[in-house]
């Protein structure tokens, strides 16, 4: 399978690359940054483009992924030191990525979120029907990202999974 990973360099994405390659998948990486030359494990092809690049659709069509995994909450391209700025950048990048994916209907899109969206105390086990309740800006941004994905799943018929 062709797997497209979207995210900045780090131990998590590198471990995913190793695992996917070991399972025999062809792994591609879109770094999300045009200028930084980051260190990734060996992949079939690395694309150094920002998520808001006009070439994003062409890259995705060229890779023709069976699965696209956006590192999301674990993407090292987002620093979150200036939360309001990162909130806008994160949600607009996700929108650009999803819009670019509307052209190819065959792949599964996976967004990595975080348990940070469930802040607070819960008496019962948290199931799929429990609404997220994050209070901090980063948590609210991740909740908004999940809702954007739900919108694309429902209105565009995309195969989207949020983990």
Per-region residue spans from a language model:
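N-terminal Rossmann NAD(P)H-binding glycine-rich loop of SDR-like oxidoreductase domains
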Residues: 3-23
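Short loop/helix-cap segments at secondary-structure boundaries that form the rim of catalytic
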Residues: 34-43
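Conserved catalytic-core motifs of eukaryotic protein kinase domains, centered on the activation segment
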Residues: 40, 78-85, 120-124
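NAD(P)H-binding glycine-rich loop region in Rossmannoid oxidoreductase-like domains
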Residues: 49-89
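Conserved glycine-rich Rossmann-like NAD(P)H-binding loop of the short-chain dehydrogenase/reductase
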Residues: 25-34
């Amino acid at each position: 399978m062709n797997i497209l990973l979207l995210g900045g360099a780090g131990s998590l994405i590198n471990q995913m690359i190793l695992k996917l390659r070991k399972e025999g998948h062809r792994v591609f990486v879109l770094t999300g940054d045009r200028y930084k030359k980051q260190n990734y494990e060996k992949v079939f092809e690395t694309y150094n483009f920002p998520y808001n690049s006009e070439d994003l659709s062409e890259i995705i069509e060229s890779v023709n992924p069976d699965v696209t995994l956006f590192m999301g909450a674990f993407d090292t391209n987002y620093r979150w030191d200036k939360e309001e700025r990162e909130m806008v950048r994160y949600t607009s990048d996700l929108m650009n990525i999803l819009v670019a994916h509307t052209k190819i209907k065959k792949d599964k899109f996976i967004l990595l979120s975080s348990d940070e969206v469930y802040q607070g105390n819960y008496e019962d086990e948290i199931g799929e029907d429990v609404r997220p309740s994050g209070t901090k800006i980063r948590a609210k941004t991740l909740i908004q990202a999940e809702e954007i994905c739900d919108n694309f799943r429902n209105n565009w018929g995309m195969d989207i999974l949020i983990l």
